Amino acid sequence: REAAYDEPDLVGLGERVERSVARELEGERFVTAVLAEIGADHEVVLLNYGHPAPMLVRRDGSVDFPEPPAFALPLGLSAHGRDGPEPYRVAFAPGEQLLLYTDGVTEARDRDGRFYPLGERTHLLKEPDAHRALERLREDLVQHTGGPPGDDAAMLLLRYHRHQEPGPGPG
């Protein structure tokens, strides 16, 4: 997180995180990740290190899982000689939501072995309060599995709110 203040772009940040992770992890251990940069141009730039594609919920309720243009290895495996991920742009407009999550969410199974249908649960994200929306999604995941998921199940919800134009100053 600290490196984000020092690196001029997302690729540089990703390279720095890769070096740090490679130093910290031993052997064949690795970490998947998605790095995201949200600007004022109604786009999010994503850098995907072998992680599940984020879920983008459009204003009309439609869902997209924007995949990277090419597969990239997870963080910590740069010694295998492959290039890092290519950044890719995804439209992200006011009123839309971007859900970043770990594979523990989508790989959570019910008693019959069915995976959690994340793309079918967007109605739970209509809750105006983002914290409550995530809590409803988490509760639904626990209900699906019949208890806490067996793997980590982290989620981060980003909502794009309209920017308020500054009003006239006192005068």
Question: Could you say what each language-model-derived stretch is?
Answer:
Residues 1-171:
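Conserved subregion of the PPM/PP2C metallophosphatase catalytic domain
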